[in-house]
Amino acid sequence: MSVSSSNLINKAVEHLSRFPGVGKKSALRMALFLLKRTEGDTIELSEALLNMRTQIQYCDQCFNLSDGPLCNVCNSPSKDTTIVCIVKDFQDVIAIENTGQYNGLFHVLGGLISPVDGIGPSDVKIPELLSRVQEKDIKEAVIALSSTLEGDTTEYYIAKKLRDLGVRVSTLSKGIAVGGELEYADEITLARSIKNRVIIDN
C-alpha cells in the first residue's frame, strides 16, 4: 500500500520499514526527516551505512564485530585478560559492556547447540574457545547465555569442557527471565546478574 503520492518516497519507506520495530508510519517519518536534511547529511548517512556493511569484519580472537583484525575490547589495555565472558552474539557483548560491571574479554559463539536443528559444538565457535583457553592464561570463564533449552544445553557442554581444562566456570545469577535474551534485559538486572555470578561446580 502506498503511503505517499511520490514513488521515490514510497520506495524509501518500503526499505526503512524492514528495520525491526519500524512500521510504515515510522518509516514515512524517517523518510520525510531525511528530505528536510541537507544533501550532504544524506550522503554522509548513506556512506556510513555502506562502509559499515562492506568493512565490518569479525575479530580474529573473540569473533565480535570489528573494524580491524582485533576488536576494541580485545585491543583495550585496561581489560582483564584472565577472564572471558562467553556469549551467543555480538548484541550480548554490547549489552554486557553497557552495564559497566564487567572488565574482561569476550568470546562470541555465533550460535547455540541445538540437536533438533542439527547444530553441534563444532558448528559454533566452541572449538575456537577451547583452543583459546589452552593458549591464553584464562583463569575464569563466565557463561552468559539465554535461559532457553539451547542455552542451557550449550552452557552444560562448555562448562564440562572448561572444568576439565582447570578453568573456573561461572554463570549469571538468576534474574534474566527464562526464555529471555540478554540483549533485552534491562541494564540494572543484567549488571546485578554479572556482579552476583554463580560458580558452576558440577
Model-derived regions, located:
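Cys/His-rich Zn2+-binding cysteine-cluster or related metal-binding knuckle/ribbon modules and their
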Residues: 3-9, 18, 30-93
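Catalytic cores of large soluble enzymes that bind and process phosphate-bearing ligands
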Residues: 4, 37, 41, 117-121, ...
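Solvent-exposed alpha-helical segments within well-ordered globular domains of core cellular machineries
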Residues: 10-14, 28-32, 43, 47, ...
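Core recognition of P-loop NTPase motor domains used across DNA-transaction enzymes
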Residues: 11, 41, 46-49, 60, ...
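Conserved, well-folded catalytic cores of nucleic-acid-processing
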Residues: 15, 19, 37, 52-55, ...
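Extended interfacial segments that mediate partner engagement and assembly in macromolecular machines
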Residues: 27, 76-144
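Long C-terminal interaction/binding lobes of large macromolecular proteins
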Residues: 130-202
